[in-house]
């Protein structure tokens, strides 16, 4: 890498409107203090009641106007604190069977949409209200990243989770939804050091994921969140990241911060990691929904 310093960006942050602990204002102050140039506010988009009945993990539909108003107030604050800081309105949008109409409605007005997979199996969508439907009782279904509820891991095993996840992730890539970035692409690695490491070879699944991202024109996020989980690698891990590089899949960076203190965490080192993996550019979003390709060094 050259001595030129690329702009510091963070495309993945959360607030207390979803499952974070900080406010928009606190995140903005943290980003400004760290010299961030672009920060995407990407709370978890509203979910059907069958998946998040108490709105513990996502922005409640009734709170969407207040969410946008709080964002706009934070954007005004950013302009005062650090005029070079661009605050971008976005959401992290879970993909699940039948989500398209919900995402289009609830994410209207978002400049950036992060696509992600946290849920496997039927979502139990019963209609416009998101009331549970009968398909919830059949096939295995549930969250894969909830340490308080590991029933799906216990039922399918680590290898089964990985196979189902890769297939679901590819379906998310193939969705007609305009996902700008696929967030934390190998999320099942979250529990790999807690007794849930796969026993099979992940290389064929990684090959499929890289080919799918390439063929559907998706970007991927290099996320520093895995480092804070004690995994010892990024999302995606080195083997999958190298496949994305070879496939020509563009990359961007995110912390997945759920606390203000984690905004921009590890992004500078993540840029160096991307360079070592073979990337020479990264993509940076703007508030108008456009993206700019920037040299890594």
Language-model regions, residue ranges each:
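Non-catalytic positions within long, well-ordered alpha-helices that form the structural scaffold/packing
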Residues: 32, 173-175, 245, 275
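Active-site-adjacent C-terminal substructures of enzyme catalytic domains
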Residues: 202-263, 280
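Hydrophobic residues within beta-strands of alpha/beta enzymes
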Residues: 39-41, 113, 182, 220, ...
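Conserved, mostly hydrophobic/aromatic
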Residues: 12, 31, 113, 184, ...
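A structural motif
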Residues: 36, 110, 177-179, 249, ...
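Extended substrate/RNA-proximal surfaces in nucleic-acid metabolism proteins
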Residues: 61-215
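An N-terminally biased module of ancient metal coordination in phosphate/nucleic-acid-related enzymes
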Residues: 1-97, 128-131, 189-193, 198-203, ...
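Mid-to-C-terminal alpha-helical segments outside catalytic/metal-binding sites
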Residues: 262-297
